[in-house]
A protein has these predicted regions:
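Transmembrane alpha-helical segments of polytopic membrane transport and secretion proteins
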Residues: 1-38, 123-125, 309-376
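A structural signal for multi-pass alpha-helical bundles of membrane permease subunits
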Residues: 31-323
Length: 376
């Protein structure tokens, strides 16, 4: 009897880890660091023209800062307390909200309609798209001069037209609501075409086969618009709403030029928050309170942005849930319908079998109407 012994194999030598070369290290650094280097100029520029002025404005708001005398004593949050107790600040904020609502809501509605019309197969499409952008190209000063003459109380075009119908002239500059409507009209005329082009670009990105499928299924133009177009451009609508909110809360040029003599009106009936900030800084020369108003306006804009984000997120979540529910319902309906069809087919097969003989009914001879034969 022989016994064979296997010799233990020698352990494999440990793999030596090669040291990466300088070129390899440079390639790894390029892959990891190059994305940050590409976006670094934006953040550097944002820090210089955005974060630094924001922080410096907050620093100024903590002092009794005069335009000519410069930095005064440290007052802490006293400027915030005094501004929040100032009735002129709340009046300007109320005027800003009123003009914002009168301008943003009609502006978005008209922009959607104009974009939907331009999305059709029109002749000279480029001409019409360029035409609606002309009000945005015109300088705000020219727009303010035109609309100031139109809304003139004595010789304005609007009051002359109303007078031809026997309507008394409206005091566009001395009453609160008419002045807000006039300023909102200026804003709408200037920004509606710009927003319409943004919405038009979103509408053109919607696949056309979806509209064709909906038309084949019998959906009309309005049904396709509300069921396909509006849900598809929801992200763009959110962008337009956010930008309109920021611009509406920072409105300055239109109310400033609407009545150049009395900025904001004789009774501050259309003085906005930014216009009140300008008055506090350059007429009262109180940079501390002006910086405080700027910071409060910044916080209000951030609050409005968060509210818009939460509302749009809620709408998107609800729409996705409804879409999944409809899809699940169609799947369940198709499964149930298939089971029902199988059940009906099985029932027909059972009914087609003669219960006495077990043979199919079509093979059983019919004896109806015959008399049995006798054995004779």
């Amino acid at each position: 009897m022989t016994t064979t012994l296997n010799r233990p194999t020698a352990a494999a030598p440990a793999a030596t880890k090669t040291k990466p070369t300088f070129r390899q290290r440079l390639n790894v650094f390029d892959v990891k660091a190059s994305p940050y280097l590409y976006i670094a100029p934006f953040f550097i520029l944002f820090a210089v023209v955005g974060l630094f002025p924001l922080g410096y404005t907050f620093f100024v708001s903590l002092f009794d800062w005069h335009l000519l005398k410069g930095q005064g004593e440290f007052v802490g949050l006293r400027n915030f307390t005094e501004v929040l107790q100032d009735r002129f600040f709340w009046n300007s904020l109320l005027n800003t909200m009123s003009i914002f609502l009168l301008s943003s809501i009609p502006q978005l509605a008209v922009a959607i309609v104009v974009a939907a019309v331009l999305d059709q197969n029109l002749r000279a499409k480029t001409f019409w798209r360029m035409s609606i952008l002309l009000p945005y190209v015109v300088t705000p000063v020219a727009v303010a001069m035109i609309f100031t003459n139109m809304f003139g109380e004595q010789y304005g075009l609007i009051n002359n037209i109303l007078g031809s119908f026997g309507i008394d002239p409206i005091l566009w500059k001395n009453e609160t609501l008419p002045s807000h409507i006039a300023i909102a009209t200026m804003v709408n005329w200037r920004w509606t075409g710009y927003n319409a082009l943004i919405l038009l670009a979103a509408m053109q990105a919607v696949p056309r086969d979806i509209y064709e499928s909906a038309a084949i299924d019998g959906a009309g133009p309005f049904r396709r618009f509300f069921s396909i177009t509006l849900p598809s451009i929801r992200p763009t609508m959110v962008f337009v709403i956010v930008t309109a909110t920021i611009g509406g809360l920072q409105i300055f040029t239109e109310p400033r030029l609407f009545d150049p003599v009395a900025a904001g009106g004789t009774q501050r009936q259309f003085q906005t928050t930014v216009l009140y900030l300008w008055e506090m800084a350059f007429q009262r020369q109180n940079f501390g309170k002006a910086s405080t108003i700027a910071w409060l306006l910044f916080l209000i804009i951030v609050l409005f942005g968060l509210v818009n984000y939460l509302i749009t997120r809620r709408i998107a979540t609800t729409a996705d849930g409804r879409r999944r529910g409809r899809t699940r319902g169609r799947r369940t309906g198709s499964t149930t319908g298939g089971e029902s069809r199988h059940h009906r087919a099985r029932q027909r097969r059972n009914d087609a079998v003669d219960p006495a003989s077990g043979t199919p009914a079509e093979t059983v001879p019919s004896t109806a109407g015959t008399t049995p034969r006798s054995g004779l």
